[in-house]
Amino acid sequence: MDGYSRVISYRSFLPPRVLAWAGMLLLTGCSTSTNQTIETLGYVFHKENEIVLTSTQLRQLPYASAYIKVGDLPQALVVLAYVNGERLSWMSADGVMFITEHGRLVKTIGLPNDLRYLGYLDQDPLRIARLDKLPSMVWYSVAEWSQKYTSGYPLSAHYRRVGNEVLEVIDKPYTTTIIEESVTASPSEVQWNNYFWIDEHSGQVRKLKQQLGPSLPVIEMTFLKPYSS
């Protein structure tokens, strides 16, 4: 089974944070609310079709979570499994890992052609959280993938605002500015566009549509319950 299919093939695997939380429930006993949460977990991690949870179900989840969609595959749910400083590792039920930093996908583990490395993240315009500065910025980076274009391909990115949208997340509206990132990979000069929905109040990325490299599928990710340290 290829990695793209594995993203939505919900089997018996649970991320470590979920296993730890479930173990705590076994030690402390289950109330009505925790029983409801366990039922939600069973629904999420064994459902084979597109995942769509109600606002109530999402509120019952005790950890950061996000919807993710890879190419034309059905929507899946990922939960926050690891935190390493500003780097957040989101895991699907069968172990595919999507790693973000400041709302950008910077690495994957378990896809057919993983993004292994993305350089110069300290200069990433998404770190700035200043919408008035983004359109005038250019970001130069270097990327490596596991199967093709494996070593140090230069990328350049330009930015512009393309609109505004109010996102409804767990019944709460977030006013966002949509930023288009136009990426060019050298030396092939292959181009593609990424999109980031940035919260006008907090500066957080609430949603992304990001292509991780030439000829790779677009990954759409909507942050439902963001991580807070």
For each predicted feature, which ranges?
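C-terminal motif of bacterial Sec signal peptides marking the signal peptidase cleavage site
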Residues: 26-29
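Surface-exposed beta-loop interaction hotspot
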Residues: 125-126
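Bacterial N-terminal signal peptides that target proteins for export
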Residues: 2-20
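Acidic, serine/threonine-rich low-complexity disordered tracts
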Residues: 31-111, 116-117, 135-229
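C-terminal partner/receptor-binding element of secreted or periplasmic proteins
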Residues: 129-135
